[in-house]
Design a protein with these regions (language model features):
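Helix N-cap/beta->alpha junction signal
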Residues: 18, 92-93
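Conserved active-site segments centered on acidic
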Residues: 2-84
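Phosphate-binding/catalytic loops
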Residues: 87, 93-134
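Short alpha-helix boundary/capping motifs
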Residues: 53, 90-91
Length: 134
């Protein structure tokens, strides 16, 4: 098999939006039988919750929809992620701007940095609201 497609989802604390996106995407990929084709992860632009599981409310809502986030743990973004991943998908414009700053510290960065909703035909350029802080 050829090289895996590597996708990183990013939000502020990595406890609500990005782990939810990771969990949903993992499930969709697995249901399609493509799990061997992808490496999927999530991270935060702030190190508030490193090592902690997703927020209990995010887990509850995900579980109600058939997604399990319980094994995920928050981590802090690294400049090296821009070499490791093909796509870095960010939930909002503030964190996108932070990621642009981080990307500058990664020599030979290859990842494509985009807003997550740029992949939705009707929501290009829009943000995923932060349910944790309103």
């Amino acid at each position: 098999m050829s090289e895996k497609i590597k996708v990183l989802f990013v939000c502020l604390g990595n406890i609500c939006r990005s782990p939810t996106a990771e969990g949903v995407f993992r499930t969709m990929v697995a249901k399609s039988g493509w799990q061997d084709m992808f490496h999927i992860d999530s991270a935060g632009t702030a190190a508030y919750y490193v090592g902690e599981p997703p927020d209990r409310r995010a887990q509850k809502q995900a579980k109600a929809r058939g997604y399990d986030l319980s094994k995920l743990r928050a981590r802090f973004i690294s400049p090296q992620d821009f070499k490791k991943f093909d796509y870095v998908l960010v939930m909002d414009k503030h964190n996108f701007a932070e990621m642009e700053k981080v990307q500058k510290y990664c020599k030979d960065a290859t990842a494509k940095l985009q807003l997550f909703l740029d992949y939705h035909p009707d929501k290009k350029g829009q943000e995923v609201p932060d349910p944790y802080s309103g």
